[in-house]
From Swiss-Prot:
GO biological process entries: proteolysis
Organism for this UniProt entry: Phaeosphaeria nodorum (strain SN15 / ATCC MYA-4574 / FGSC 10173) (Glume blotch fungus)
Residues annotated to bind Mn(2+) 2: D447, D458, E570
Cofactor entry: Mn(2+)
Binding site for Mn(2+) 1: D458, E556, E570
UniProt KW keywords: Aminopeptidase, Hydrolase, Manganese, Metal-binding, Metalloprotease, Protease
Keyword Flavoprotein part of the UniProt annotation: no
Coiled-coil intervals, chain numbering: none
Protein's name according to its UniProt entry: Probable Xaa-Pro aminopeptidase P
Top class in the EC scheme: hydrolase
Entry function: Catalyzes the removal of a penultimate prolyl residue from the N-termini of peptides.
Catalytic activity: Release of any N-terminal amino acid, including proline, that is linked to proline, even from a dipeptide or tripeptide
Length: 650
């Protein structure tokens, strides 16, 4: 590693890696080695809440001493650019520090949160805002004059590495892979053991397709591509392909693993102690089991053998996902021997079969009943019993209610239980001892979801228990109109989520309002609650993948006023073929089927803003909600009365 000028770029999942133990060990290493580090927070919503995260609130973190120590050490080490701990706890961010600057980049979901948490030492780069540089541009601007930016290749994609390398090269710098991961050196022998939770089988009654069929389908894709094989690196893709589920990653039923599929061999890389007898019986002798740690050595040898064989075809390559790490690409021999593509497994996984679709329908009935029971309880506690409840109390109660329902396996993300101004923090996470008391006179936003053996849920409802302001009612109704419009749209086959995004925003736009997040994300079947490659929004990737029959996706427009309130309404919708009077271009036309079954808040609806057609749509929806969920409340008068009131016709 060159000593003249180095920045070390480290990317890890906040959900996987941000633990109290790691932060403590990082601090010890800083004192010991005079080095400071910060990882960009990339990831997804976490499955279980770590003690460290529970200790974090939304207050500013004074980083003056940290930065002073870091800059002193940077001068000693002749380091010009480094990443560092900023005090920001959002799940998507990137911090970079130079001798005289410190910047953190994040997207619109976290502008509010970052402004609350970052102290005056930091420049906030609001990604996506006009004239604000990307973090890559900002980083490249700091390395003029031959400086070196180092990266652990196992935590960046090949595409991201190439893009940043090009930017740095144009500035006269160098971007290179560094073998050692600083966090791994920090932990050393004190690093916590990798989770050893047992893997379970996702049976045919829920998966609807055998893993043999899925492997055969993948091999057909490999044949079309004339490929030597496919390295599976996304955990949810491994789980889906083999009809297995795990519990290694908070809220996501996956397990640490890789897989390699060639035309003749299927190999699963996993700690074999995690596989009980029923899993081994399920896999049989069709799948070779290799240690998780063997993946890089094995694929290096596999590639070498393939390209050095006497009958080797120089035109054939190995395939990896375009979301796979740069390290996988390098282990297979680099760009000349690897083609990075949108994963065919990801594409197949996003198209649910009839068994999976029916599972989504059924789990949302149970989940909708749980949410209604919670809202009825919460209203009674706040208005009738005058109880004092904080946001965590609410989230815990909702989880307890969900646990009573059949096939419940856990939450699908941390419940966003937010009152008043906290609702404006789009990915708000309440912490016991640092959260707010639920105010019955303020808007309450609840975004929550669960994992069931037959499906995954994600529902957001916004409530007001007393008298909302005119602006709150107007904003809520505009969001509701957008939610309905998106669900009701019909579109030709081949349409992307990028093309549909404005349908949900149109009523807000007409008033000069908007929201800084996507309108929809794909959802797994007892898998990750955020699932690609589909989505509805302005991300470039959403313009590259057409929506297809069998996709399950969220419909979640919103509106937020910093320091005041947040509004979001989220339903799960499934793509289906629909009838139209004409079929221009002889194309099938598609539409959506909702599966979420939770009432909208009557108290927040401004009836004067709804058309008669929209009122009928809501009435029909509420009738369905009552018919499908009221059976759970035959002996629960409180919830039954609440449900009857909330689903009564307008």
């Amino acid at each position: 590693m060159p000593r003249d000028a180095l920045s070390f770029e480290l990317q890890l999942s906040a959900g996987l890696e941000a633990t109290e133990h790691k932060l403590d060990m990082l601090t010890r290493l800083l004192r010991r080695t005079h080095v400071a580090v910060k990882h960009p927070l990339l990831a997804s919503r976490a499955f279980h809440t770590s003690p460290a995260l529970r200790a974090i609130d939304m207050a500013k973190v004074d980083t003056t001493e940290r930065l002073a120590e870091l800059r002193k050490l940077m001068k000693e080490r002749k380091v010009d650019v480094y990443t560092y701990i900023s005090g920001f706890t959002g799940s998507a961010g990137y911090a970079v520090v130079t001798h005289d600057k410190a910047a953190l980049a994040t997207d619109g979901r976290y502008f509010n949160q970052a402004e609350k948490q970052l102290d005056s030492n930091w420049e906030l780069l609001k990604q996506g805002i006009q004239d604000v540089p990307t973090i890559q541009e900002w980083t490249a601007d700091q390395v003029e004059g031959g400086k070196v930016v180092g990266v652990d290749p196992s935590v960046v994609t090949g595409a991201d590495a190439r893009k940043l390398a090009e930017k740095i090269k144009k500035k006269g710098g160098e971007y290179k892979a560094v073998d050692d991961n600083l966090v791994d050196l920090v932990w050393a022998a004190e690093r916590p053991a990798r989770p050893s939770e047992k893997v379970i089988v996702q049976p045919m009654e829920y998966s609807g397709k055998s893993f043999d069929e899925k492997v055969e389908d993948l091999r057909k894709e490999l044949e079309k591509k004339k490929s030597l094989g496919f390295v599976v690196s996304m955990l949810d893709e491994v789980a889906w392909l083999f009809n297995l589920r795990g519990n290694d990653i908070p809220y996501n039923p996956v397990f640490f693993s890789y897989a390699v599929i060639t035309p003749t061999v299927v190999t699963l890389y996993v700690d074999e102690s995690k596989l009980p007898k029923e899993v081994k019986d399920h896999l049989g002798d069709k799948v070779a089991i290799r240690p998780y740690e063997a993946i890089f050595g094995d694929i290096t040898a596999l590639s070498k053998d393939a390209f050095e064989a006497a009958d080797a075809d120089a035109t054939k390559k190995f395939l990896t996902s375009n979301r796979a790490s740069w390290a996988l690409n390098k282990a297979l021999g680099g760009d000349d021997k690897v083609e990075e593509i949108r994963s065919p497994i990801g594409d197949a996984k996003a198209v649910k079969n009839e068994v999976e679709l029916e599972g989504m329908r059924q789990c949302h009935i149970r989940d909708g009943a749980a949410i209604s029971e919670y809202f009825a309880w919460l209203e009674d506690q706040l208005l009738n019993k005058k109880a004092t409840l904080d946001e965590v109390d609410g989230a815990d109660k909702l989880e307890a209610i969900r646990k009573k329902h059949d096939k419940f396996m856990g939450l699908s993300f941390d419940t966003i239980s937010s009152t008043g101004p906290n609702g404006a923090v789009i990915h708000y996470k309440p912490e016991k001892g640092a959260c707010s008391i639920i105010d019955p006179n303020a808007i309450y936003l609840c975004d929550s979801g669960a994992q069931y053996h037959d499906g995954t849920t994600d529902t957001t409802r916004t409530l007001h228990f007393t008298k909302p302001t005119d602006m709150e009612k107007k904003a809520y109704t505009l969001v509701l109109k957008g939610n309905i419009a998106l669900e009701r749209v019909k579109f030709p086959k081949g349409t992307t989520g990028f093309a549909l995004d404005s349908i949900a925003r149109q009523f807000l736009w007409a008033e000069g309002l908007d929201y800084r997040h996507g309108t929809g994300h794909g959802v797994g079947s007892f898998l990750n609650v955020h699932e690609g490659p589909i989505g509805i929004g302005t991300r470039v990737q959403y313009s590259e993948v057409s929506l297809a029959v069998g996709n399950v996706i969220s419909d979640e427009p919103g509106y937020y006023e910093d320091g005041k309130f947040g509004i979001r309404i989220e339903n799960m919708i499934m793509v289906k073929e629909v009838e139209t009077n004409h079929k221009f271009g002889d194309k099938p036309y598609l539409g959506f089927e909702h599966v979420t079954l939770t009432p909208h808040c009557r108290n927040l609806v401004d009836m004067t803003l709804l058309t008669e057609d929209e009122k009928k749509f809501i009435n029909d929806y509420h009738k369905e909600v009552f018919e499908k969920t009221s059976k759970f409340f035959e002996n629960d008068k409180l919830t039954m009365d609440w449900l009857k009131r909330e689903t009564a016709p307008y």
